[in-house]
Amino acid sequence: MIDDTYNSSPAAAAAALQTLYSFDDAAERIVVLGDMCELGASSQMEHEKLGSMCDPNLLAWVVTVGPESERYIAPAARRRGCQVHIARNAIEAGEFVRSVTQGNAIVLVKGSQDTIYLEECVKVLCNMTEDVRLVRQDAQWMAKKEAFFQQFK
């Protein structure tokens, strides 16, 4: 597991994806990509560019979370020939990845913080009971996330 859920930018996401590709001993590689926020007018271009970096020869799955990722990363990755799953939220993404992961998989989880909350995907994948090591776990963040995830119930 590569937990890079604190925040994201085009350069950081590209570097994280290249790091995932560098693991030679992985039976499979899965990437969970969330929106990169605060990109303004360049959002479409940057999300599409990241999607086009997804290599079907190196990735078993591309999982997206967030509206920009659904609109731009997912189609670009599909055009490259990748298997893509669009998740409604981070928890659903974690459940999906857990259902398709086999044996020696390496999973990269990368996205911006606001309304993406990919640390919750990591929590699902790791079956974590003690989550103090994850980002955004204090009472204020947990209340904000609880309110956010209510829309999916």
Predicted features and spans:
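ATP-dependent carboxylate-amine ligase
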Residues: M1-K153
